[in-house]
Swiss-Prot record:
Keyword annotations of the record: Ribonucleoprotein, Ribosomal protein, RNA-binding, rRNA-binding
One Pfam entry name: KH_2
Organism of origin: Geobacillus kaustophilus (strain HTA426)
The gene coding this protein: rpsC
Protein name: Small ribosomal subunit protein uS3
Domain of life: Bacteria
The family this protein is said to belong to: Belongs to the universal ribosomal protein uS3 family.
Amino acid sequence: MGQKVNPIGLRIGIIRDWESRWYAEKDYADLLHEDLKIREYISKRLQDAAVSRVEIERAANRVNVTIHTAKPGMVIGKGGSEVEALRKALAQLTGKRVHINIVEIKKPDLDARLVAENIARQLENRVSFRRAQKQAIQRAMRAGAKGIKTMVSGRLGGADIARSEHYSEGTVPLHTLRADIDYGTAEADTTYGKIGVKVWIYRGEVLPTKKKAEEGGK
C-alpha cells in the first residue's frame, strides 16, 4: 500500500499537517474551490519563484496565506511591491482581507516539488532525461538526503512508445509512517508531448515528541 499511495497524504495527522487549516459547514465546497483558485493563481503568477507549497488558514473574513519559496526576494519584490500587488490580487479574487507570509526554503535540493520542477524544466530544454535525473539525485544526496527516487514517464527522448524510467539512491522507506518522505510531481511540455516527473525524498525519521513518548510509556 505504501508503494502506491501519495506519501504526504498517508502521513497527514501523523508527522505531516494539512495545507489548508480551517473549518466550515455549509460553505465547505465554496471555500475549497476558493483555496484551489488561490493556489492556481499563485502557481501561475510565481512560476519562476520556486514556490513549493501554499498553506491557507481562515478566520472570520480573513485569509492567511503562507508561501514556501526558495526565492523570497522574487516574491517580495523591490520594497515589497510584488507581495503587495499579490495581496491586492488575492483580496480581489476572494473578496476577503488577505495576509501573506513568506517562508524561505533553506535547502531547495531537499524539496521534492522543486526538484521535480527542476527536472521538468531541463527536459523542456532538451537535456537528456538520464542526465537530469542523475544530477538531481547527486545534488539531493550532497544536501543531506538519506535517500531519493526519481521517475519520468512519457515519450522519453522522442520515442514512439511511452515508457517510465526511474533512478534511486539511498533508502526510501515508503511503508514507515515516521519516515519524513517528501513527494512532488511536475510536468514537462516537450515537442513530443507531456512528460510526467515524480520525486520521492527521504529526509530521515521524525521521532515522536517527548510529551507523546511519556504518554506512551504510561
